Curated annotation (Swiss-Prot):
Stated name of the protein: TOM1-like protein 2
A GO MF label: phosphatidylinositol binding
InterPro entries recorded: ENTH_VHS, GAT_dom, GAT_sf, TOM1, TOM1L2_VHS_dom, VHS_dom
Region (Disordered): 164-219, 466-507
Length: 507
């Protein structure tokens, strides 16, 4: 295609675009940009030649410095050229085939390039939505939104409108400028520091300055004063930019935020005066400096607006978070006297306040403390005496039926009771007659043992004879293979065994 149509940079407007988008430029050449707009408006093939040159510079270019300069030229031309150029720009082939391809993920462009392209598409879609022959960009914009592409937030009311003004640099005889009134020039330059501020929005980069009056020229002294004042503006822009870089939205200090807002108001007032001078000063060098300062102001204003949006959004999130925390704490309502309903403010109070709050809780009559206090209190000493008395009486009743063969066991039991009494020590017995009852019981057992005599040898022989006769009447049984015959149990021993079992059952 290039072979048939020739080099896009060979045309007059193509040469200007090649120079204006050269990557070696330190900043935008606004004089050259406005000259490109004039050529497009005045020549028949200007719009087509300009689009060919811009496509060549944008298509597949990985030098994003040149891409940003080309996008600035494109934006300037759209705002300063007519319908013929708009038709070329809003065509679907250019928007989808060139601009959208620049921000594709495979090219991995910088964020500033992505934001610039998306902002241009969004602004053009909004401006040309009502024009039937310029809706190609509108369709691309809607498709990108359906795909989930997030466009940067932009205050469309604060941006300059897309229109085609008259020629920005009128053709005036240079000799006419020499006859300009000195009073008019002095009043023009004094506007930078003495004019009152008005609430007019700032213009976007590349926006056309309004025509306020006729062109004026200034002497070296006035230019020096103007440049010194521009240095002050640059200093304010630098301070504001550094503050925006250092500050975090939602975490800024009150004094820093107040200073930043003051700088924003001051810089906006200065920009209004700069925009007024851009259209009236005929010195190209001064005009270029004014345009550069205006562009810096626009950039820092965009950063400030983004900072404010993030700050307000963060503060709104924090407010919603606090409200939701309070709501969650009060979900369970246990009544006005419930200790579970504690607000977040009470959690950080001093321990004394917490103690006073706990002390003021209303405890009902059915609580555990009231129930325990209502129980009858007994002396532990009385409880032990009652237990000892019960054990003593039951033991005395059981001992009445027990017989002993060995009189020495009597002394052992008495000594054991004495030891038990010594171990109990300082616990007094409620009734002093208990020990007397035990002694009486032991004396009765002793008398019973004395009356009971052992088995005599005659009785034992008689018992053996009876057993032998009984054994003769019983049929013979096979004797066990080993072991001795069982010994007959003595009736006295059987009695002792039965008494021991009774004692165990009683215990």
């Amino acid at each position: 295609m290039e072979f048939l149509l020739g080099n896009p940079y060979s045309t007059p407007v193509g040469q200007c675009i090649e120079k204006a988008t050269d990557g070696s430029l330190q900043s935008e050449d606004w004089t050259l940009n406005m000259e490109i707009c004039d050529i497009i408006n005045e020549t028949e093939e200007g719009p087509k030649d300009a689009m060919r040159a811009l496509k060549k510079r944008l298509n597949g270019n990985r030098n994003y410095r040149e891409v940003m300069l080309a996008l600035t030229v494109l934006e300037t031309c759209v705002k300063n050229c007519g319908h013929r150029f708009h038709v070329q720009v809003t065509h679907r082939d250019f928007i989808d085939g060139i601009l959208v391809k620049i921000i594709s993920p495979k090219n991995n462009p910088p964020t500033i390039v992505q934001d610039k392209v998306l902002a241009l598409i969004q602004a053009w879609a909004d401006a040309f939505r009502s024009s039937p022959d310029l809706t190609g960009v509108v369709h691309i914009y809607e498709e990108l939104k359906r795909k989930g592409i997030e466009f940067p937030m932009a205050d469309l009311d604060a941006l300059s409108p897309i229109h085609t003004p008259q020629r920005s640099v009128p053709e005036v005889d240079p000799a006419t400028n020499m006859h300009t009134s000195q009073t008019q020039k002095r009043d023009s330059f004094s506007n930078l520091s003495n004019s009152k501020s008005t609430s007019t929005p700032y213009t976007a980069p590349g926006g056309p300055p309004p025509n306020v009056g006729g062109p004026i020229s200034a002497n070296s002294e006035q230019i020096g004063r103007l440049r010194s004042e521009l240095d002050i503006v640059r200093g304010n822009v630098k301070v504001m930019s550094e503050m925006l870089t250092e500050m975090t939205p939602g975490q800024e200090g009150a004094s820093d935020l107040e200073l930043l807002q003051d700088l924003n108001r001051t810089c906006r007032t200065m920009q209004e005066r700069i925009v007024e001078l851009i259209s009236r000063v005929s010195n190209e060098e001064v005009t270029e400096e004014l345009l550069h300062v205006n562009d810096d102001l626009n950039n820092v204003f965009l950063r400030y607006e983004r900072f404010e949006r993030y700050r307000l959004g963060r503060s709104a999130q924090n407010t919603n978070g606090v409200l939701s925390d309070v709501t969650e704490d009060n979900l369970i309502d246990l009544g006005p006297g419930s200790p579970a309903v504690v607000s977040p403010m009470l959690a950080n109070t001093a321990p004394s306040n917490l103690s006073s709050q706990l002390g003021g809780l209303d405890v009902g009559t059915n609580s555990v403390s009231s129930t325990l206090s209502a129980l009858p209190t007994t002396n532990p000493k009385d409880d032990f005496d009652m237990f000892a008395h019960t054990r003593t009486n039951s033991l005395a009743d059981q001992r009445k039926n027990v017989t002993y063969e060995d009189p020495q066991a009597l002394g052992g039991l008495v000594s054991a009771l004495d030891v038990r009494k010594q171990n109990i020590g300082g616990i007094p017995v409620s009734q002093p007659s208990d020990m007397d009852d035990i002694e009486d019981w032991l004396s009765k057992d002793l008398k019973g043992d004395e009356l009971e005599e052992g088995v005599t040898s005659e009785e034992f022989d008689k018992f053996l004879e009876e057993r032998a006769k009984a054994a003769e009447r019983v049929p013979d049984l096979p004797s066990p293979p080993t072991g001795e015959p069982a010994q007959p149990m003595n009736p006295a021993g059987r009695k002792k065994q039965e008494s021991s079992e009774d004692k165990l059952f009683a215990l």
